[in-house]
Regions:
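C-terminal terminal-subdomain/extension
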Residues: 1-26, 91-146
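Short alpha-helix capping/helix-loop boundary micro-motifs
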Residues: 29-36
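Short acidic, S/G/P-rich loop/turn micro-motifs used as interaction or catalytic elements
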Residues: 53
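Compact nucleic-acid interaction/catalytic patches
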Residues: 56-99
Length: 146
């Protein structure tokens, strides 16, 4: 998608409406947490707006592997499409299924982060990873040296 002034204005308006809704609900009930309309579980991949970051960091929208659901937050590993060449030592290629189509995706362990559930794009379907959550957690632990 091309970044234009109109696209950015639409994205900003959308984020503003989400914040207004979130704070209204939070004032009504302090224990309330945002629950996305998309049903997913740990081990699925969801499309997440990672926002604008520093150079050399992933930003904007990416499919992310959900490692851990922590009420209002998620521990995720962002992914990219598989380009030519082998993955680096901090990347891993996995097979995924989106709407019945099988493809490859490259998990980038060095970009692992905790994000708010409000960053999930519920208009996009979830992707199913053909790799077990236990194996991904093992590889993540191996990457961080645990």
């Amino acid at each position: 998608m091309e970044v234009t002034k109109e696209n950015l204005e639409v994205a900003l308006d959308h984020l503003k409406s989400q914040w207004v809704y979130y704070w209204k609900k939070k004032k009504e009930n302090p224990k309330w947490g945002y629950i996305p309309t998309l049903e997913f579980q740990e081990g699925d991949m969801v499309y997440i707006n990672l926002d604008v970051n520093f150079p050399h960091e992933m930003c904007f929208g990416h499919w992310c592997y959900v490692v851990k659901d922590m009420e209002g937050k998620l521990l995720v590993i962002p992914s990219t499409s598989v380009k030519d060449g082998c993955p680096c030592k901090y990347e891993m290629d996995i097979n995924v299924t989106l709407d019945g189509r099988k493809m490859k995706s490259r998990l980038n362990f060095s970009e692992t982060r905790v994000i708010d559930k409000m960053r999930i794009d519920c208009k996009k379907p979830k992707m199913k990873a053909e790799c077990s959550l236990v194996f991904i957690k093992y590889k993540l632990k191996e990457f961080i040296g645990g």
